[in-house]
Amino acid sequence: MKKMKLVLVGNGMAGVRAVEELIKLAPDLYDITVFGSEPHPNYNRILLSPVLAGEQTVEQIILNSWEWYAENHITLHAGKTVTEVDRVRRIVRAAAKDGSVIEAEYDRLLLCTGSNPFILPVPGKDLQGVIAYRDIADTNTMIETAKTHKHAVVIGGGLLGLEAANGLMLRGMSVTVVHVNAWLMERQLDDVAGGLLRKSLEDRGLKFLLNAQTQELVDDGNGRVKAVRFKDGTETPADLVVMAVGIRPNTALAESMRLHCHRGIVVTDSLQTVTDARIYAVGECAAHRGIAYGLVAPLFEQGKVAANHLAHLGIGRYQGSLTSTKLKVTGIDLFSAGDFMGGEGTEEIVMSDPFGGVYKKLVIKNDKLVGACLFGDTADGNWYFRLLQEGCNVRDIRGQLMFGEPHGA
């Protein structure tokens, strides 16, 4: 039987995981072609921070070696950017660095174009020394810059920004984190935990400017950044500026294909685009029920469902994901999930030990745990997340909740 043709646009974690799942379910159904704009096989983007910090090498974060593609009879076009998709003839066209064009036909198309970093629209954003932090090339630029320059400014006090700041500090740079909000990681932490995080990072040598609005990146006269100027007129020196102020789904290709996009490529519960059932979208580029996810767990869940449908099983349904954040920033453990800010109709149980560097906050509503924010001691994070996911009634264990999972539970 002649095989169908599957083309994957985007050689990242979400798309390749979907292909792995598909190969498990239907190893001989498709001839698979993969296009990736980076000149690398699939790697673990989450581990770019340890690479920046000098704790791991690029080779150590590769998830799928060149050999894996060959062993699974996958045609990989690495370093080739897809520029056009003809939906009528079902042809994908990609451009190589030398200008040559590669074409591939498809019966099914999987779009995993990911996201683009948001760049603040301020004067000086195009100066040399101003970068985002998304891939191996960005990481290598930071490592090289740290060898010859002293002052770094990271704009953005979220997870990515703090990891970039920590890595640059370990590379010997003097690092200032600039954040527009009143506390760090406001999407994952409340003000108390955010304050504890700031103090811990200051103790390690990072500097912070909070409630700071960037007005301009200042030119040194030779086309390179030399300082960041703020709305209040003050400046801080910068040989390197790293923008870590969020991401936007990369929908440019999908829009050129006239696929419906709103906060991402709009998909159904089967991860098929609402415009064209032959085309699937998975990962940061996809908008499911109005949400584009930027964390790995939901992307892998999506990949599993898409693979199920591509394998003609057709029983998987993606229902959305409850997400949690569990992370380590310079040895500091953090965990948050659900509605950890609380509010009307909720009850909060709080344990705070600022001297020991431990803070726990649990939010309860209608006898159910609806949110958790942990700092310094995250041992029970997985248990709390399970209670959240399953919507368990916690009335009978309310008194013990703060002390962790009961034995025999």
Question: Residue ranges of each PLM-predicted region?
Answer:
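FAD-binding core/adjacent interface of flavoenzyme oxidoreductases
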Residues: M1-V7, N64-V153, N211, R229-E235, ...
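Mid-to-C-terminal Rossmann-like scaffold of FAD/NAD(P)H-dependent oxidoreductases
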Residues: K2-K5, K24, C285-N382
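Glycine-rich Rossmann-fold phosphate-binding loop(s) that bind the pyrophosphate
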Residues: G10-A14, R134-D135, I155-G158
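A Rossmann-like FAD-binding core segment of flavoenzymes
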Residues: D31, L76-K97, A104, L170-V267
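FAD-site-proximal beta/loop scaffold in flavoenzymes
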Residues: D126-H149, D219-R229, T234-N308
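Cysteine/selenocysteine-centered motifs that mediate thiol-based redox chemistry or coordinate metal-sulfur cofactors
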Residues: M142, V394-A409
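A short, polar/charged loop-to-alpha-helix boundary motif
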Residues: T378-D396
